[in-house]
């Protein structure tokens, strides 16, 4: 018997963060990469997270994106957060296990001086990968995706 879709599909949670107003972009990046990320990575791996990435979007990149958007007729909303954290896992139990880890609570407390608590943004969904390492993947010989149907995949975790 196959595992339920809630155990097979890869979930992606993103949390977009804004830095504290008195922290420079460079100091924020230095803190994230020099202090926070290595400790967080070990903690997340210990608790079953399959992937953990941090995406940085400094003002210079946001400005460039705004210019690109304007050149294309402004079809997009250009988000203005400083960094987005991505977590990949198979089920919400994995997320809850990590979130309830006492070490995670310590990690979150250390964020206080750097990350604004006023407005963070979160999203959760599933991942369908179609190109990996420059190669087309998960497409059958019939040219159709090999993923289960939307009705199965869209059952909330």
Please report, for each region that a protein language model flagged, where it lies by residue.
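Macromolecular interaction modules
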Residues: 1-157
């Amino acid at each position: 018997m196959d595992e339920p879709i809630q155990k097979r599909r890869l979930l992606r949670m993103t949390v977009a963060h804004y830095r504290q107003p008195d922290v420079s972009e460079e100091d924020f990046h230095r803190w994230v990469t020099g202090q926070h990320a290595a400790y967080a990575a070990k903690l997340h791996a210990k608790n079953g997270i399959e992937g953990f990435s941090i995406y940085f979007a400094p003002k210079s990149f946001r400005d460039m994106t705004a210019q690109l958007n304007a050149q294309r007729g402004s079809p997009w909303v250009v988000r203005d957060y400083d960094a987005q954290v991505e977590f990949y896992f198979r089920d919400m139990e994995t997320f809850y296990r990590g979130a309830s880890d006492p070490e995670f609570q310590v990690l979150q407390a250390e964020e206080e001086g750097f990350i604004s608590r006023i407005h963070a943004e979160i999203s959760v969904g599933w991942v369908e990968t179609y190109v990996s390492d420059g190669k087309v993947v998960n497409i059958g010989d019939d040219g159709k995706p090999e993923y289960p149907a939307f009705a199965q995949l869209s059952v909330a975790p």
